Amino acid sequence: MNWRCDVQNFEPDVKISLTRVGVTNLKKLVRLKRTNKRPIILLSTFEVFVNLPSSQKGIHMSRNPEVIEGIIDEALELESYEMETICEEIVKRLFEKHEYATEAEVFMVSDFMTKEKSPISGKYSQEIHKIMGGAKGIKKDDEIELTKIVGAEVVGITACPCAQNLIKEICIKNLKEKGFSDEDIDKILDSVIFATHNQRGIGRIILEVPTGYDIEIMDIIEIIKKSMSAEIHGILKRADEAYVVEQSHKNPKFVEDCVREMAKRVVEKFKHLPDETKVLIRQINMESIHRHDAFAEKVATLGELRRELLSYE
């Protein structure tokens, strides 16, 4: 049947342009081929947006899922494909479907499984991390300026430096009251690990770069993991558990420390990325003895981070 009425093309009652209109929470199964490796299967959640001029009542909403479906099918035919590349292709296709749009944006989040082993026993377990891919496009005349988005979110453990120092002071006071000499106290302090409270830390890094630059998602995952007090694991035998607790308490970190460490490692790792690369670094620590959670964030360009770090060398 040919539908004669296209309400979306009507003029709106209130003629105001809209920054982003689209669909969210759109779930799709994505299969990424890899050269000489098994494909990666991802259950991904998409957000897809275009801008809307003041002269048009609505976007053609059903075109967004249609575009995603088509790009996913095409990705199955290629030898190798990445999340952000899929998103770039979706953005290009959105401009074809929404001829009135001058801006388009796609963001996808997926659970990504890696096989990792525990630190002492070497037991393998499946570890799940969140990975993000995306793209933004701005259309000027017939040219489309693209940027791509790559990111990850990883869970780890942090140990509070403040509480640990309080416990250390209490121990020193108790040892002095029991008659230990300063020399003996120093030997004892060097031999023991002081208690503190822990948090489950959630670290996130998202990079937005011009098209043409490649970022390996595992590099981002490793940076986040190494920036907390210790890594967590799906399987821990007794020796592993002791090791993780010991390592986390030997490496106490505030939520602020985690963000600064991630920023430093991003600068060190991604020397090939241009200064205009946008960087979002975020850490949330879920407190164990407080009713609140701790939060820290850094938003900057890679060039700003480089200059800030150089100024203190």
Swiss-Prot record:
Coiled-coil regions listed in the entry: none
Enzyme nomenclature, EC number: 3.5.4.39
Uppermost EC category: hydrolase
Site (May be catalytically important): C160
InterPro entries (UniProt xref): GTP_cyclohydrolase_FolE2/MptA, GTP_cyclohydrolase_MptA
Stored Gene3D superfamilies: Urate Oxidase (3.10.270.10)
Protein name in UniProt: GTP cyclohydrolase MptA
Cofactor (UniProt): Fe(2+)
Role description: Converts GTP to 7,8-dihydro-D-neopterin 2',3'-cyclic phosphate, the first intermediate in the biosynthesis of coenzyme methanopterin. It is also able to utilize a variety of GTP analogs as substrates, including GDP, beta,gamma-methylene-GTP and GTP-[gamma-thio].
Protein's pathway: Cofactor biosynthesis; 5,6,7,8-tetrahydromethanopterin biosynthesis
Pfam families registered for this protein in UniProt: GCHY-1 (PF02649)
Temperature dependence: MptA loses 27% activity when it incubates for 10 minutes at 80 degrees Celsius, 60% activity at 90 degrees Celsius, and 89% activity at 100 degrees Celsius.
Catalyzed reactions per annotation: GTP + H2O = 7,8-dihydroneopterin 2',3'-cyclic phosphate + formate + diphosphate + H(+)
Assembly: Homodimer.
Note: MptA is the archetype of a new class of GTP cyclohydrolases that catalyzes a series of reactions most similar to that seen with GTPCHI but unique in that the cyclic phosphate is the product.
Keywords: Hydrolase, Iron, Manganese, Metal-binding, Zinc
GO molecular function: ferrous iron binding; GTP cyclohydrolase activity; GTP cyclohydrolase I activity; GTP cyclohydrolase IV activity; identical protein binding; protein homodimerization activity
Activity-pH behavior: Optimum pH is 6.5.
Regulation: Inhibited by GTP concentrations greater than 0.3 mM and by 2-amino-5-formylamino-6-ribofuranosylamino-4(3H)-pyrimidinone 5'-phosphate (fapyGMP). Partial inhibition is observed when 2 mM GMP, dGTP, or 7-methyl-GTP was included along with 2 mM GTP.
Gene Ontology biological process terms from the UniProt entry: methanopterin-containing compound biosynthetic process; tetrahydromethanopterin biosynthetic process
Cofactor note as given: Binds 1 Fe(2+) ion per subunit. Mn(2+) and Zn(2+) can be used to a lesser extent, but not at a relevant physiological concentration.
Source organism per UniProt: Methanocaldococcus jannaschii (strain ATCC 43067 / DSM 2661 / JAL-1 / JCM 10045 / NBRC 100440)
Family: Belongs to the GTP cyclohydrolase IV family.
